[in-house]
Amino acid sequence: MTRTVIAQGTFDILHPGHVHYLEEAAAMGDELLVIVARKSNVDHKEKPICPAAQRRDVVAALEAVDDAIVGHEEDIFAPIEAIDPDVIALGHDQHHDDDAIEAELERRGIDCTVERASAREPEREDEILSTRLIIDRILERRG
């Protein structure tokens, strides 16, 4: 039986931290499906710069990812219900409340575990592992 993992996020301006998260998520199962957040659902930080379809295409091109979709406009759990994964892998710094996610999964009858990926430490002094910091650097140098 295939062990399906879902990862999710905004993935605006892909960086090594995103790749680390998705590689760890892929290692949690046999198949990794990624849900890319719609701009309308991003309310915990600045809205993404790149369109959702573009972010999905870039994520889908990664070797660790089997498929990527854009999330539902109104119900962020709708794709999870449709996929019925074995694991939901969260990034180490994602704002989600693990207990609230588990409660909603139980309420909807979705039997899966919620796991957190580890943080990736910079491998070089100048490595940037944050979309916000990449944007800040661009504005600093080109703004």
From Swiss-Prot:
Chemical reaction(s) catalysed: FMN + ATP + H(+) = FAD + diphosphate
**Quaternary form?**
Homodimer.
Give its E.C. classification number.
2.7.7.2
An individual GO BP term: FMN metabolic process
Q: In which pathway does it act?
A: Cofactor biosynthesis; FAD biosynthesis; FAD from FMN: step 1/1
Any GO MF annotation of the entry: FMN adenylyltransferase activity
What cofactor requirement does the entry state?
A: a divalent metal cation
Name the domain of life. Archaea
User: Function, please?
Assistant: Catalyzes the transfer of the AMP portion of ATP to flavin mononucleotide (FMN) to produce flavin adenine dinucleotide (FAD) coenzyme.
Organism listed in the record: Haloterrigena turkmenica (strain ATCC 51198 / DSM 5511 / JCM 9101 / NCIMB 13204 / VKM B-1734 / 4k)
Annotated keywords: ATP-binding, FAD, Flavoprotein, FMN, Nucleotide-binding, Nucleotidyltransferase, Transferase
**Which enzyme type, at the first EC level?**
transferase
Q: What is this protein called?
A: FAD synthase
According to its UniProt record, which protein family does this protein belong to? Belongs to the archaeal FAD synthase family.
Q: Any idea which positions bind ATP?
A: 10-11, 15-18, 93
- One Pfam entry name: CTP_transf_like
